Amino acid sequence: MSFLPVIMAGGTGSRLWPLSREYHPKQFLSVEGKLSMLQNTIKRLASLSTEEPVVICNDRHRFLVAEQLREIDKLANNIILEPVGRNTAPAIALAAFCALQNADNADPLLLVLAADHVIQDEIAFTKAVRHAEEYAANGKLVTFGIVPTHAETGYGYIRRGELIGNDAYAVAEFVEKPDIDTAGDYFKSGKYYWNSGMFLFRASSYLNELKYLSPEIYKACEKAVGHINPDLDFIRIDKEEFMSCPSDSIDYAVMEHTQHAVVIPMSAGWSDVGSWSSLWDISNKDYQRNVLKGDIFAHACNDNYIYSEDMFISAIGVSNLVIVQTTDALLVANKDTVQDVKKIVDYLKRNDRNEYKQHQEVFRPWGKYNVIDSGKNYLVRCITVKPGEKFVAQMHHHRAEHWIVLSGTARVTKGEQTYMVSENESTFIPPNTIHALENPGMTPLKLIEIQSGTYLGEDDIIRLEQRSGFSKEWTNERS
């Protein structure tokens, strides 16, 4: 029997700031190796017989998801966009309704996974999923409980009930994150598992329970999926209908109340990577228990996590620190209190700082750009345009633009003229001039853009055409 993976890639995780940002949360980060957490989540399904995954994400993350799926050859009209976040119960309902509408298998088994978890033992993971298959196929709602390795206060727990099969238990209760003494009691009892947030069930089984236990969520999601607007690789649901949907987790809405919940124990080196200290826990370390990533020199240091994006970092005689450098921010924290990084993010939000929101590298449907420098009346960006992509025709009243081609060839439209600009050549776009840029080549086009003028705001972009095949929201995101 095959599975339909449902990957939940929503959320705006702030716990790994400054690497994670609101527009680039942790599920899109590469914490180990070259692949992101999202990509690794999909890759670990290779040993299971699965259909192409369905990914559910926030609308603002759609370009990131599409690009990361394309990189691993998994982009196939399979991204459901949530216009607003409504937690996991509605998100899974959207996937279940879509699965029943579109699947060749009339009632597929949904393997629901978070995009931002790490699983180190993929063989054990696969074995647990296979073990859960028979229960899910027969109408049970299976959740995977992580066998705890220590007393942990950072996770919710699942208490197992009666044994219903070989290493499969009825769910007795879900419990909130405990204090350290209670967590110790849970660990000693052997009857409690960490709540992984991973599930396996038939699409119809989940929807039937949701309809019975949370009818408002069921009805709102049913209506939202009833007005789907396909948009290339994206599935856009009805925004107004989904806005009326209550926000609730699958645990609260369904799993805590259903009579059909089953927990399957799993020991697979699982982590939700909920903090820098937990990332240090699962990372490969040197002989002094340091995790060093980037251009780093460490002398007489131990138990540190040090990450450099583009600077040389030297450390002498320090221990138990998290040091993370990006192009626009530096974090220095004690590993024992690094969870307070959320206070930094709150500070940045209160002061309307860009550092909580996005990196200097920003992805767009046509490619990406990096902000190199900015100041009064100027902005400098390095722009990469993918082969065959373009900026739609537009103009600006208050700024001029200089384009300098570094590699590739640009087809430029300026007013009534259309001409080619090659490597080491440049062109100038005056204010109040209709212009467009296209990469007609087979390789990426890379250029430097210098904006100059009295006003550089986003509302001084007047677009004169809609990008073919894309919604208006896409054309509103050149900058």
Show where each model-derived region lies.
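Conserved core of the sugar-phosphate nucleotidyltransferase
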Residues: D121-F242, V262
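Left-handed beta-helix
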Residues: S2, S204-I404, T409-F428, H435, ...
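Residue-level signal for inorganic ion chemistry
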Residues: F28, L38, A95, D116, ...
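Noncatalytic nucleic-acid binding interfaces
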Residues: L447
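A residue-level structural signature of the nucleotidyltransferase/glycosyltransferase Rossmann-like core
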Residues: L110, K191, M198-F199, S271, ...
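Short beta-strand segments
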Residues: I7-A9, I56, L111-A114, T143-V147, ...
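A short, conserved beta-strand element in the Rossmann-like catalytic core
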Residues: V118-I119, T427
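Conserved N-terminal catalytic core of the sugar/cofactor nucleotidyltransferase
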Residues: S2-I7, S14-E22, S30-A114, Q120-A124, ...
